[in-house]
Amino acid sequence: MEFIDLSNKDSVRLIKDVLLYPLKINKDKSGVLVETLRTDWRQIYGKGREFAMQYYSITAPGIARDENLWHYHPTVQEDRFLVVQGEVVVAIADYRKESPTYKSLNLFQMSNKMLYDHIYLNIA
């Protein structure tokens, strides 16, 4: 199965309601500044798309979290993923019977070393 990122997102079948959103990286000699969430990003935030919680997680190098465990959310939930250091693979399976991508699986490779550095993976 092919990993999905910003470079190939238009050539693969994304699960319905999944959005990859590139973030603008502002770099200069003093460092890096990245806006991670703005209320005027209508694809990510807006009426009916408010967010209630934000957190970050650090995992030690060489460790895989939930390697043999899947998280299932039986209710409507939007998650926004952002990787600022390291690499992560996010697997998303569509079990919404009314969805045109029902029973589809997408694997998203996200890393700070990729061409676009940071992306939002927005899942409705």
Task: Please provide the spans of the model-predicted regions.
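Non-catalytic, conserved peripheral segments adjacent to functional cores
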Residues: M1-M114
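Conserved metal-binding segment of the jelly-roll/cupin
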Residues: S111-A124
